[in-house]
UniProtKB/Swiss-Prot annotation:
Protein name, per record: NH(3)-dependent NAD(+) synthetase
HAMAP family: NadE_ammonia_dep
Protein's GO biological process: NAD biosynthetic process
Enzyme class: ligase
Binding site for Mg(2+): 56, 172
Binding residues for deamido-NAD(+): 147, 180, 187, 267-268
Organism domain of life: Bacteria
Its biological purpose: Catalyzes the ATP-dependent amidation of deamido-NAD to form NAD. Uses ammonia as a nitrogen source.
Annotated binding of ATP, by residue: 50-57, 167, 196, 218
Transmembrane segments: none
Keyword Hydrolase: no
CDD domains xrefs: NAD_synthase (cd00553)
E.C. numbers: 6.3.1.5
Amino acid sequence: MHAVQRQIAEQLKVQPPFADQNALQAEVARRVGFIKDCLQNARLKTLVLGISGGVDSLTAGLLAQRAVKELRESTGDTRYRFIAVRLPYVVQADEHEAQASVDFIEPDERHTINIGSSVKALAAEVKAFDGLPASSVDFVLGNTKARMRMVAQYTVAGAYQGLVIGTDHAAEAVMGFFTKFGDGACDLAPLSGLVKNQVRAIARHFGAPESLVEKVPTADLEDLSPGKPDEASHGVTYAEIDAFLHGEPVREEAFRIICETYAKTQHKRELPYAP
């Protein structure tokens, strides 16, 4: 393992590969326990998570639903619940898969909040967009969509006195592949430290369909590049990112891209600067 790989893996608290099924099961139990502890320590009863249709929110949702189910069983308190929220922007191209994810999770409650009108209303009021290239406006509004989705989740959580779950994991964190104060904002991040193939492995552990587990990851935030795969944005594959984080050899160009991107996005992984 290169010293830089070791340093980054330590900073992101990357978990080692699952040695076997027993190790995977133990990690699932640990993360479910973490969610339960967070909820009980906050003295709250509700968890809220936006379900996009990707494997990250699918896996986080499965962990959350198991956590509240176990809390109901162990405490006898039926008020513990998990709310899955669909947050489409106007019409989502992969809505069928998003609904399939919600159906498989079987959350206690499901809500749908369309963020389209909110994002468009805000965009119409932003004079700073005047004269900007369409591509720049589209990119900024992509981040606005992510932030509006988190606003919606916190609104639901506020109404039900709950905590918001995030879906960030090590393979996204190392690339800074999240919107600051958007999908990067949450009360608890139960996938933290996992690489992408571990997130998929946990989804499989729950019996999730392969069509959802292996769905091509996409943030799908930009109107001018609908459904753009994450890996096209990264310039490297998730397999290469996972290998890098686990200290395995990767091609020279992938090593360079990951290291440079990690350094460039450091501000996204830190709290606001203060004097």
